[in-house]
């Protein structure tokens, strides 16, 4: 069995007058995130982790913010495309672990819905998906409520022929 680990990281600042979408879930908050796509910083980090595990670069390479085709793009569609690239190479998801770093809004009430989105889009069991949140104790840009950062790690496996 061949196993690969991928790590993804993404950051977006608050400031857009739009819904705040995190992991495909609309989270009530006073503002959305500034981005070329829908700004789903969680799915961007997971997509980057999958691409990293496959040595395929990052989401900026596959979905450049200079391409108007991705203006306002649904990040769930982008995530599924990244996972399709992995499946085309014979890989499947082992598990995903996500850490959302934000002083606000409160993430905990939305974690189960976020896990379900990832399980659905990655065709995984719910117990293979972990989403957690933390703060930076009011330090740095996330602590000042200027934006959200996310780290994601995926384990991908392929049976050897």
UniProtKB/Swiss-Prot annotation:
Its EC number is 4.6.1.12. It comes from the Bacteria. A divalent metal cation binds at residues 10, 12, 44. The record marks 36, 135 as: Transition state stabilizer. Binds 1 divalent metal cation per subunit. PROSITE patterns: ISPF. 4-CDP-2-C-methyl-D-erythritol 2-phosphate binds at residues 10-12, 36-37, 58-60, 63-67, 134-137, 141, 144. Pathway: Isoprenoid biosynthesis; isopentenyl diphosphate biosynthesis via DXP pathway; isopentenyl diphosphate from 1-deoxy-D-xylulose 5-phosphate: step 4/6. It holds the Pfam family YgbB. Transmembrane segments: none annotated. The keyword Lipid biosynthesis does not apply. Coiled coil: none annotated. HAMAP family: IspF. Belongs to the IspF family. Homotrimer. Involved in the biosynthesis of isopentenyl diphosphate (IPP) and dimethylallyl diphosphate (DMAPP), two major building blocks of isoprenoid compounds. Catalyzes the conversion of 4-diphosphocytidyl-2-C-methyl-D-erythritol 2-phosphate (CDP-ME2P) to 2-C-methyl-D-erythritol 2,4-cyclodiphosphate (ME-CPP) with a corresponding release of cytidine 5-monophosphate (CMP). This is 2-C-methyl-D-erythritol 2,4-cyclodiphosphate synthase. It comes from Shewanella sp. (strain W3-18-1).
